[in-house]
Amino acid sequence: MADWRPMLKRREDGFPRIMGIVNVTPDSFHASSRSSNIEHVVETAVRMASEGADWIDVGGESTRPGASPVTIEDELSRVIPAIEAIRSQLPNICISIDTRRSEVAEEALDSGADMVNDVSALSDSGMLLSLIHI
């Protein structure tokens, strides 16, 4: 796993870092970030990287208000193929997994993600333990 800490610091040129968001959900808060199949996921990630994204964030569960939670199995079946496909086409880009679940974070990290974006701020009691071991 690459050391992404320098990339996460402020850029020397003063410009902000850019995160490209790829949601593999049918009900994402941002409709334009939704990707419905692996080919579209890869096309979207490659385009974002070519347009200047510093990293790609992959999410498999909508965080929009009123969204129904998905099972761990459904989330995994959405994000793992996406992460693996992005990693195969963009081997040097940083990939984050957007999840609130430690099980998904662990599988994603094992499948090529580099960091975790947890909007629940580690509310899953296992998340911190999972992150300590990476």
Locate predicted features.
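Conserved, mostly hydrophobic/aromatic
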Residues: 22, 48, 52, 98, ...
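Conserved small/polar residues in nucleotide/adenosyl-binding loops
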Residues: 132-134
